[in-house]
Curated annotation (Swiss-Prot):
This is Diaminopimelate epimerase. Pathway: Amino-acid biosynthesis; L-lysine biosynthesis via DAP pathway; DL-2,6-diaminopimelate from LL-2,6-diaminopimelate: step 1/1. Its main location: cytoplasm. Catalyzes the stereoinversion of LL-2,6-diaminopimelate (L,L-DAP) to meso-diaminopimelate (meso-DAP), a precursor of L-lysine and an essential component of the bacterial peptidoglycan. GO terms for molecular function: diaminopimelate epimerase activity.
Amino acid sequence: MGIEFTKYHGLGNDFILIDNRHGSEPMVSPEMAVEMCDRHFGIGADGVIFVLPGTSQTDYQMRIFNSDGSEPEMCGNGIRCLAQFIAELEKTTEVGKSYRIDTLGGLMTPRLEAQEQVTVDMGLPRLLGSEIPTTLVSRTEKVIDQPIEVAGQSWLVTCVSMGNPHCITFVEDVKSIALETIGPQFEHHVAFPQRTNTEFIEVLRPDYLKMRVWERGAGITLACGTGACASVVAGVLTGKSDRRCTVELPGGCLSIYWSETDGHVYMTGPAKRVFTGVYEM
């Protein structure tokens, strides 16, 4: 038995996309997703994304398994790839076409742009301790420049949920961060009961941030869309950045805007098709 798939990437954050429109649950188990994501013995990816039928209020549903088999609520680069994949399935190239996508992190609305770009209305950032979730503060408080001890060092962190948890810390030089050592300690810190994604941000200008990320369930990746969104929100909350920023990641740049009008965060970036294939079970 073989499973047809298409591989996409958003700034090097790569995914296996599967057409799952004829079933209400992912056709691949978390264990199989781990095998498919293996870069030596499988296809190789940061995660597997499934396009499932939508509800009466949405066009489609998005589900994801990370490369470790865990299931995140949302993925910013992944939803851009999902939008391009849906357009491929629907055989449309209509610029301005949008989709209402149901995710475990809430409703997301990606819109197709020219030149393989996708803009996503990521919705409202969630800032309360109970919404992250984290025990760094009370359930009704915001986490802004809160101290935390990690790897024998004190860090000031700001926490934001974009449908999934993010812990953001601003540093002088992102290159100097030993991400492979510090990242897992943030992810599994006792203050984050559902674990966390962690972004290390260097402010080059108020409208230009440089970011490295340790993703919950995936480790070091070349890009994280929700992380870029959360980082701009954190930058505004701490007075370090503008509401409209370019965020530079190892895989390229994203344009992020936290609107004062509706409070939503908007992300624009690429989603590129790599290849199609059949994975033999």
